[in-house]
Amino acid sequence: MSFVAHPNIDPRSLGKVGVLLGGRSAEREISLMSGNGVLAALQSRGVDAHGFDPGLQGVAELAAAGFDRVFIALHGRYGEDGTIQGLLEQLGVPYTGSGVLASALAMDKQATKRLWMTHGLATPRFAMLHADTDFDAVVADLGLPLIVKPAREGSSIGLTKVTAADQMRAAFDKAAALDNDVIAETFVDGAELTCPVVGEGDTAEALPVIRIVAPEANYDYQNKYFTDDTQYLCPSGLDAEVERQVQALAVQAYRVLGCRGWARADVMLRADGTPFLLEMNTSPGMTGHSLVPMAARAVGISYEDFVLQVLAAATLDLHPNEHWKPE
């Protein structure tokens, strides 16, 4: 395991650190929770860490802050879609998590699924929806139930489980209010799983799988963050070989997208034992209900030590010497 229980990291070597939190996406509330947790964890380890909210503070302020590296605790648009990553590349400030391209790909569910399919990785069949789409034809092709959701949102925001064809229009309208691109995918009936991955390229490896048991099998925004009724099982209770298969699939999905640092793959395990990839989260939640810290704890890594190691791995797509400097 590249991440360890007691990392030998000198907090002074990390310099002045910015924790980006809040932002302007529909997931702002969750990002504030994640970011404040990360900020407190880093400060408890002696890191010179400071919160920075791009939803309230501008680019000039970020450039003037003098951060030596940044922990991205933003979720959703402008935070994990390549936007802030591109800005930090321009500023030459190393940041946590995936680079510009991998972040943009993973945020776009259509692009992610097409890439996974090209590499032979199992993911539910899907169709893109538009206002003039023949919804009956989509239902006839994909079957019911369907999951209809914005193509570029997270935390189950704007998501609807459609069980009858006459529900399609309302489901589309709900998702389209958040994104111009709406996706419908076949519903996979089975166990809901998630698997964090850390590292990069050939060194990427999976943390333990978590099985999610939500009230009435409805793991929505409310049940993800604001209820204690959802059960998170880690160890997952899966057969050891099935767990290894899910972990291997998560690592493959991570590598295909070009992710680095850390991410979390969401997976459905069909009753016949076949795992299906749903999406990849390149800036996972770090709240009290979040799953990555839970998986880390299962292998003896505390929240604080995990955060410290994510930060220590901050980097850039380009080597600092490759960044343009005015003559």
From Swiss-Prot:
Compartment(s) where it occurs, according to its Swiss-Prot or TrEMBL record: Cytoplasm
GO cellular component, one term: cytosol
Cofactor annotation comment: Binds 2 magnesium or manganese ions per subunit.
Enzyme Commission no: 6.3.2.4
GO molecular function: ATP binding; D-alanine-D-alanine ligase activity; metal ion binding
Residues reported to bind ATP: 139-194
Keywords: ATP-binding, Cell shape, Cell wall biogenesis/degradation, Cytoplasm, Ligase, Magnesium, Manganese, Metal-binding, Nucleotide-binding, Peptidoglycan synthesis
A Pfam family hit: Dala_Dala_lig_C
Primary residence: cytoplasm
Required co-factors: Mg(2+); Mn(2+)
GO biological process: cell wall organization; peptidoglycan biosynthetic process; regulation of cell shape
Annotated Mg(2+) 2 binding sites: E279, N281
Residue sites binding Mg(2+) 1 per the record: D266, E279
InterPro entries: ATP-grasp (IPR011761), ATP_grasp_subdomain_1 (IPR013815), D-Ala_lig_Van_CS (IPR000291), D_ala_D_ala (IPR005905), Dala_Dala_lig_C (IPR011095), Dala_Dala_lig_N (IPR011127), PreATP-grasp_dom_sf (IPR016185)
PROSITE patterns tied to this protein: ATP_GRASP, DALA_DALA_LIGASE_1, DALA_DALA_LIGASE_2
Free-text function comment from the UniProt entry: Cell wall formation.
PANTHER family registered for this protein in UniProt: D-ALANINE--D-ALANINE LIGASE, D-ALANINE--D-ALANINE LIGASE B
Protein name per UniProt: D-alanine--D-alanine ligase
